[in-house]
Amino acid sequence: KIYVCNTLRTTVCIHAAVCTIENKGISDCICKVKKGGFSKVGEVQIKPFKRVLVANRGEIAIRVYRALNELGITTVGIYSKEDRYALFRSKADESYQLKENKGPVDAYLDIKGIIEIAKKANVDAIHPGYGFLSENPDFVEACEEAGIVFIGPSKDIMNAMGDKISSKQMAIKAGVPIIPGVDHALKTEEEVMKVADMVGYPVMLKASNGGGGRGMRIVNNAEDMPKEYREACNESKKAFGDDQIFIEKYIRGPKHIEVQVLADNYGNVVHLYDRDCSVQRRHQKVVEYAPAFSIPETTRQIIFDSAIKLCKQVGYRNAVYKA
């Protein structure tokens, strides 16, 4: 049986329509998308997810459960021994306890244990939420090897965009605006001093694999650079496993604006508008609010266009389905 969708032709809307059809007792259906609109492939055949495991906890897991419930998908949860009485456990249709010897945090980082539960529960896909394993390419690879769909970016995209130097190079290829600086690792103090003079102080030293607010140092003058560079390399080596450092111009009092994007398997990318994340402590966001205010609409549109352009350049996807 073939049903033609008259809804918005994006992966998420199509998936929701197919789930609705299935929930009404119509089986073995094919969703056919007419050529045009947002679809670039002409015809898409989708097998809706029936069971999805959420590899997270707390409010994050509850939000994903709710979205899955709205689509008529069975939710499978995981929880540590310490979380056995937590609210989120009862919100899933099925829940499985993680290994007891892992602790309250490491239990949610146990790739092997989570995959074992996913197989036992016979799930079609795993949604990582955010944090924990959501940006771990090894987890994505483990899902692929188990024949389970990972709802998120591919491991190649994670590896490429998780490295700040690599991601900056991709941004340059995409033709999107970037902060003045260099797109390669600096190997010597002499090279660092030369680049800093070229960019102009103040500058920021950044670890290519930095994250969590660490791996960034502001340098206001040439006298401080040798010491700051050595300390930045040592910190990066200890915290992230390598000492690749690059330089960007330091911008005082900037607005930190993020854009939420949705990208499917076929290169369709849409933005879900912006949010302001400028309120920070130690380079980590404290408060986010949307939409961002005090931004000219022309600038806002440039940000949206740049986000979509970059996603298309790298082949990013975060809305996936079982084809």
Language-model segments: what does each one mean?
Residues 13, 19, 29-31:
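Cysteine-centric signal of extracytoplasmic or virion-exposed proteins
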Residues 4-7, 16, 20:
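Short hydrophobic alpha-helical segments enriched in small aliphatic residues
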Residues 26-322:
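N-terminal beta-alpha lobe that positions the nucleotide/phosphoryl donor
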Residues 1-3, 41:
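Accessible peptide chain termini
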